[in-house]
Amino acid sequence: MKYNLLNNMKINNKKLKLKLILMMITMKRLNNMNQHNIYKNRYYNKNNNLQYLNKLNTYNNKMYYFNKQLMNNMLIIDNTFNNLLKKMMMSNNILMTNLKFEHRTNSIHIKYYFYNYMNINNDELSKLYNNYMMSINNQMINLLNNDNNSLNNLMTKYYNKKVYINTYKLNYMYLDTELLSQTLTNIYNNNGLSLKSLKMIINKLPFNNDMLLSKNYVNKMNKYNLTINNNLNNNKKDLINLYTLDNKLLDLSITNNMLLGKYLVGSNIQLKGRTLNRNITRTMKMNIMKGTFNNYMYQWSKLNNLYKLNYMSTNINKTNNTFINKNGMFNIKIKLNTI
């Protein structure tokens, strides 16, 4: 009997040890999975940390007034100024985004992006057109900021604050969804937008691989840190002549690579509605996706909740425009993923 009891005790101890070993293995596996998910989220979602620094960077208008009537009046002035400036730009064949307002205590800062969508192949005509556009841009800058009768001075009378207008020229229309949607609507209004023409436009967009970009960025940063750390113990003259001696270090362009929204990674264009083509009587539906949205992570949960603040990450640019024609309505949804 004693021998049987001892055997049973040994067997039970072995079972307990096996259970403890299995529990330790599962705990280690779960910890590794959690760490892997953390690193994966950091890697794919590296731009989202900026959202927590500025909780209002997704809105086009930043203002707060204690008086609601004053706030409504400011919104009306903002909308009218936005529409007037857009009409002025369209008359000069220039596409522009909606104005982004920032109301401060003593000043108002306004910024927008614009793009010249006239493309001329002939060299002589292109030179004439470039000179013409340079003169228009200079006139616009003088109209916005420099002259005594500039828009800044005119808008200060309405706002009773100092107004600063900052313009940014984009060389490519795919860098902003509003500009891309406006170019598509121009093609739609002039020639009619078909599936073939839309695919041609999307195929011309330069898509990049986010994995290669991130690896190149990490390698450049490591090389930069190594060169700096190796030369920390040298003299000041060597540190000053560091960039002139190392030509490869000049080609790193780290600050240029740190810019957000520089490289296009993926696009999703959805069209729905009635076109101007008489042969097509029914509504048209097209959804074309190219590239990747791997780094597309929501801020708060896996589900897309429109009612939460900053539910979209900073690397996603999204627009939704609806246009009315003689046959009905036409809707364009564009989503661009940048890194």
From Swiss-Prot:
Protein name in the entry: Small ribosomal subunit protein uS3m
UniProt cross-references to Pfam families, sorted A to Z: VAR1
A GO molecular-function descriptor: structural constituent of ribosome
Protein's job: Essential for mitochondrial protein synthesis and required for the maturation of small ribosomal subunits.
Keyword Ribonucleoprotein: yes
Subcellular location: Mitochondrion
GO biological processes: mitochondrial translation
Record-level GO cellular component terms: mitochondrial small ribosomal subunit
Main location: mitochondrion
Family matches, as InterPro entries: Ribosomal_uS3m_fun
Annotated source species: Eremothecium gossypii (strain ATCC 10895 / CBS 109.51 / FGSC 9923 / NRRL Y-1056)
Keyword terms of this UniProt record: Mitochondrion, Ribonucleoprotein, Ribosomal protein
Similarity section: Belongs to the universal ribosomal protein uS3 family.
Keyword Acetylation tagged: no
Domain of life of the organism encoding this protein: Eukaryota
